[in-house]
Every structure is written in C-alpha cells, then in structure tokens.
From Swiss-Prot:
Organism placement in taxonomy: Bacteria, Pseudomonadati, Pseudomonadota, Gammaproteobacteria, Pasteurellales
Xref: Gene3D superfamilies: Jelly Rolls (2.60.120.10)
Protein name, UniProt field: Uncharacterized protein HI_0804
Origin: domain of life: Bacteria
C-alpha cells in the first residue's frame, strides 16, 4: 500500500475548519444519499464507509485510519454521498467546509495535488487487487 505524508487541516487556506470532535463507536458521520457540505480529516480512530442496497444489506467498501481525509470525493464531484460513514473505533474528526470549490482548489494547490495523489494511489490499488 502507498503511504502519503499527511497534510494537516490547519495548513488549508480560505475555508472554515471546525474544532476536533470526538465521536463514539457506531456514530453516524453522514448518511448515504445526503448532500455534502464538508469533508473530513480523521485525527485518530477508525471510520468505515458502508453502501446500502435496496434490500437493506450493507457492504463495507472502505476503511479510513488516523491522518486520512474522507468525504472529499463526493463534495468535489457535487453529488450525494454514495455510502454512509460510521465510526468503528472512537474517533477524533475535523470538519472542513471548503465553500466555493474552484476557489478552494486555487487557494490550496499543494493540498489539491495531495488529494490527486491519494485518488491516483487508490485507483492503482483497486486495479491491482
């Protein structure tokens, strides 16, 4: 697996960043079908993404560990969440509200490159599994 050095939220420009919030195991962060307003940085803990089928069955699609971002794929694609995010181990989470997406990307070029590398590595890993 590829490991990228993580990029701290406090280094982001022209966006609103929440204080870290501790969420207990089984807490719902966001639900499948909701429209996103923010994305997240996991300071510590474990978060799972679950996709629900029409028959009610849930499938774990991805795990996020400490120092990873999640929820950004959906917010930048301007769609609804395709999965629900749930806390699997007590987690400290920072919410990031980017506002205008084009401005956020322009004001955070290093972070934008970081996210592109993360997406590229995830695609590469999916193609080799």
């Amino acid at each position: 697996m590829f490991t990228l050095p993580y990029y701290l939220p406090q280094n982001l420009n022209k966006c609103i960043i929440s204080e870290s919030k501790t969420l207990e195991k089984n807490s719902l962060i966001y639900a499948q079908g909701e429209k996103p307003k923010e994305f997240y940085f996991l300071k510590q803990g474990l978060v799972g993404l679950y996709h629900s089928l029409e028959n009610g069955k849930e499938t774990l699609t991805r795990l996020y560990h400490a120092n990873e971002y999640f929820g950004f794929r959906t917010i930048f694609s301007e769609t609804s969440y395709h999965c629900s995010a749930k806390v699997l181990m007590e987690a400290d989470i920072v919410r990031i509200f980017p506002g205008n997406h084009a401005n956020f990307i322009a004001n955070n070029p290093d972070f934008s490159c970081y996210l592109m590398k993360q997406l590229s590595n995830e695609l590469l890993m999916q193609n080799t599994e």
